[in-house]
């Protein structure tokens, strides 16, 4: 065994960056900021063996998208049902296939005040570029996130929110959003 502990893992500074040309393009596309911007990822790859545990149905979290924020879907593909629901939410923007690759996603993440996501590659991307990340985990999360604790040894600006065993996603997401609201209000 390596004898690795939390204290021996270097707490990394951002080690990836978004391309400046993409940052400029997305900044213009987003326009003037009037509220805190929150990127949102609720679903991972549906072919992942644990997707049923780590992804959440959009209609479960939609009622909790507070008007205090401008929400931005960082999802690439979404269902027709989700698209119809998104169209009804004024403070949520979905770019869809305009997000062509991870360099686009990185630029968008960097322009957010926070990124709220389930356990997907976007959580790692946002963490690696130094974003404020709120990671939502089910109670049987991947081992890299450890069994307890609210900090990540891999990303210094990541806050881990752990769903209790048997807890529904709706009250859990509501709790996460309220915690984000408190943080953002204190930053005003």
Model-inferred region functions:
Residues 1-188:
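Catalytic machinery of carbohydrate-active enzymes
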């Amino acid at each position: 065994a390596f004898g690795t502990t939390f204290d021996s893992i270097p707490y990394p500074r951002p080690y990836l960056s978004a391309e400046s040309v993409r940052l400029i393009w997305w900044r213009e596309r987003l326009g003037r900021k009037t509220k805190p911007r929150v990127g949102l990822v609720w679903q991972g790859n549906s072919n992942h063996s644990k997707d049923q545990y780590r992804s959440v149905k959009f209609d479960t979290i939609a009622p909790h998208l507070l008007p205090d924020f401008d929400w931005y879907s960082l999802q690439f593909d979404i269902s027709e049902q989700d698209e119809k629901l998104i169209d009804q939410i004024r403070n949520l923007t979905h770019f869809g296939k305009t997000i062509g690759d991870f360099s686009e996603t990185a630029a968008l993440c960097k322009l957010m005040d926070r990124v709220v996501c389930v356990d997907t590659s976007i959580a790692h991307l946002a963490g690696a570029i130094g974003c404020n990340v709120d990671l939502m985990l089910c109670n049987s999360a991947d081992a890299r996130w450890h069994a307890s604790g609210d900090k990540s040894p891999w990303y210094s600006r990541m806050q881990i929110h752990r769903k209790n065993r048997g807890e529904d996603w709706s009250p859990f997401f509501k709790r996460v959003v309220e915690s984000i609201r408190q943080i953002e209000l204190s930053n005003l």
